[in-house]
């Protein structure tokens, strides 16, 4: 059994159907696993869509027949966006939907050894969305400083096209993209620890308004401090956080999978801990 986040199931359904629609180019074992998983993933996705529609019926505006009222576009035609009675109703709908999407489903999925399909070049997101189908990764525990965690996170986001402003999703060998996404999840846990500590330090040293919100400098997003000593103490302790060691689980991938990939040399240097000969 595999635990799969509900939001991933929705994306996986789309990617599996795209894979099956152009299956002649894909490895046979990958196509076979996708075909075996299609019905199961589709059923789960349909259940999630039904739940979303039910939530809309509870929180969005409806007509006398119970149909959901859509917002009107500038051209006078209804859009895909539902209309809500208030901002509070919209917020509650989004919170409830976020809760169900963050839950996980236990599914008995068909898997395939990553080394048998890893060279197949596909959209980078497939490495994340279809990750539950892949087995056989070698993993390794690594100790990274906080600064290295941030640099590694930034490098992976650049390679996978996760940065804002990227117009076209990159295509990468499946083993490479999946290894990066798996490691990214572990890095995110360490990054959360760093951010939580940073906010604690801001709460301790920065200026705050009556509601306890940290004040920022004029025309800036930088925190405002009551005096130089407080700002110095903040940066000193923050540097300690960045120099602390954090355990990360790296999914290893052979350096050969970067052949033909448009990747800056500095990313290879930063991500050396997950690359092997």
Question: Language-model segments: what does each one mean?
Answer:
Residues 1-277:
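A composition-driven surface/loop motif
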């Amino acid at each position: 059994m595999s635990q799969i986040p509900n939001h991933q199931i929705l994306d996986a359904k789309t990617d599996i159907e795209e894979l099956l629609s152009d299956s002649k180019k894909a490895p046979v074992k990958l196509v076979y696993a996708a075909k075996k998983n299609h019905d199961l993933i589709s059923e789960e996705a349909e259940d999630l869509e039904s739940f979303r529609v039910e939530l809309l019926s509870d929180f969005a505006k409806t007509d006398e027949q119970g149909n959901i009222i859509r917002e009107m576009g500038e051209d006078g035609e209804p859009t895909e966006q539902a209309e809500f009675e208030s901002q509070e109703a919209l917020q509650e709908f989004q919170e409830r939907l976020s809760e169900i999407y963050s839950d996980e489903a236990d599914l008995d999925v068909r898997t395939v050894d990553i080394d048998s399909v890893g060279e197949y070049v596909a959209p980078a997101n497939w490495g994340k969305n279809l990750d539950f189908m892949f087995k056989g990764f070698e993993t390794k525990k690594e100790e990274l400083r906080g600064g290295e965690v941030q640099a590694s996170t930034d490098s992976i986001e650049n390679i996978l096209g996760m940065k804002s402003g990227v117009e076209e999703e990159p295509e990468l060998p499946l083993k490479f993209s999946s290894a990066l996404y798996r490691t990214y999840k572990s890095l995110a846990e360490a990054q959360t620890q760093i951010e939580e500590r940073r906010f604690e330090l801001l709460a301790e040293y920065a200026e705050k308004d009556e509601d306890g919100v940290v004040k920022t400098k004029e025309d800036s997003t930088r925190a405002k401090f009551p005096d130089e000593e407080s700002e110095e103490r903040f940066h000193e302790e923050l540097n300690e956080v960045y120099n602390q060691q954090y355990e990360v689980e790296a999914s290893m991938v052979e350096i050969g999978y970067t052949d033909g990939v448009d990747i800056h040399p500095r990313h290879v240097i930063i991500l050396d801990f997950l690359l092997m000969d």
